[in-house]
Amino acid sequence: MRLKDKVAIITGGSRGIGYATADKFLKEGATVILTASSQGSADKAVAQLKEKYPDATVAGISPNLSNLESVRNAFREAASKYGCIDILVNNAGVSESTPFTEYTEETFDKVMDLNVKGVFNATRAASECMIAKGQGVILSTS
């Protein structure tokens, strides 16, 4: 798939695999909107990527991925600014190294909210634009 002139949203794009994916997509000519858990983290990643690719279009947002309306609003705003979303990379996730017998319900909910509900919400929000134009790609990492 050619990435030139495609609009991609990458959740968890401020570090690790998400950041590397954003880097590769920008290198190939895509417009990248990355999400991070805080706007500060998103801004830092965007600044680093803009330094490397000064002519590229890259932006950072920090919706609450466990809240559908927060994600919808952020993705709709991104689409109105940069164009309909062509590619969604569901990469955001969290893990806990707590032994299972010490895992609390609160910890379980935190992990499920991002790792499961976050993927659902991002996919649901991105698919609105994709369905309207009749195409799109959704990738999920694990």
List the predicted regions and their residue ranges.
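The beta1-alpha1 cofactor-binding region of Rossmann-like NAD(H)/NADP(H)-dependent oxidoreductases
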Residues: 39-40, 62-73, 105
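Conserved NAD(P)H cofactor-binding loop of Rossmann-fold oxidoreductase domains
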Residues: 91-96
